[in-house]
């Protein structure tokens, strides 16, 4: 990116392909106003400065998903006459983002169990990158693993999130840290336990996450 481009501005061509819920009726109130989406994109492009077209595309996709009744979006940002030193008409980037369905289990068997769980649920609901669809009843379960400890309070929630799996994991771990969780004994007691049970239909096996 040349300095002059940030000062004088650049030309972009933006397209957005959106997946919306099936229309059960002809009610405009439940549809997506494509004119409003176009103006929303135009406002981002005109009034914000980005050094990378990748960042611009991310901001557009995230904004559409958060502000309109859209489940998935593919955003393409094209920069005509990009100064890349080659005879190209343009340079472009295309990204696909969506609300990912996931199931999170929660539990506690130390201290104020109900309060730890309640605070975690409220923090998850307050995160703009997460929508909480359903929260189960909380049940009492016996501890597993042979370590003598108090009974657990357990439950599960269905969410939709803009996070990738590892990003969701890191957010949940930050809530565990806020609850002063200490990882010393395997299968040991804990103030707060938040686990990703399912993430879409993905099978994940990395150094830090197994789903």
Could you say what each language-model-derived stretch is?
Residues 24-26, 101, 144-151, 166-211:
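Flexible, gly/pro- and Lys/Arg-enriched active-site loops
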Residues 23-35, 119, 123-164:
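Short, surface-exposed acidic-centric catalytic microdomains
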Residues 2, 78-82, 138-145, 185-186:
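Short, solvent-exposed loop/turn elements at beta->coil junctions and helix N-caps
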Residues 1-102:
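N-terminal, polar/charged subdomain of small-to-medium soluble alpha/beta proteins
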Residues 102-121, 129-130:
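Extended accessory regions or peripheral subdomains of proteins
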């Amino acid at each position: 990116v040349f300095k002059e481009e940030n000062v004088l501005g650049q030309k972009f061509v933006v397209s957005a392909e959106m997946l919306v819920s099936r229309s059960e009726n002809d009610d405009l109130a439940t549809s997506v106003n494509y004119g409003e989406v176009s103006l929303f994109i135009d406002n981002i492009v005109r009034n914000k400065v980005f050094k990378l077209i990748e960042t611009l595309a991310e901001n557009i996709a995230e904004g559409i998903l958060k502000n309109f009744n859209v489940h998935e979006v593919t955003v393409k940002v094209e920069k005509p006459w990009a100064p890349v030193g080659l005879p190209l008409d343009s340079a472009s980037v295309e990204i696909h983002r969506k609300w990912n369905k996931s199931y999170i289990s929660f539990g506690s068997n130390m201290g104020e169990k109900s309060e730890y769980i309640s605070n975690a649920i409220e923090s998850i609901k307050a995160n703009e990158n997460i929508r909480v669809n359903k929260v189960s009843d909380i049940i009492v379960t016996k501890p597993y693993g042979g370590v003598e400890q108090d009974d657990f309070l357990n439950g599960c929630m269905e969410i939709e999130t803009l996070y990738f799996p590892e990003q969701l994991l890191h957010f949940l771990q930050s809530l565990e840290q806020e609850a002063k969780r200490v990882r010393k004994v395997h299968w040991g007691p804990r103030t707060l336990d938040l686990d990703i049970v399912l993430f879409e239909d993905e099978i994940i096996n990395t150094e830090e996450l197994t789903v």
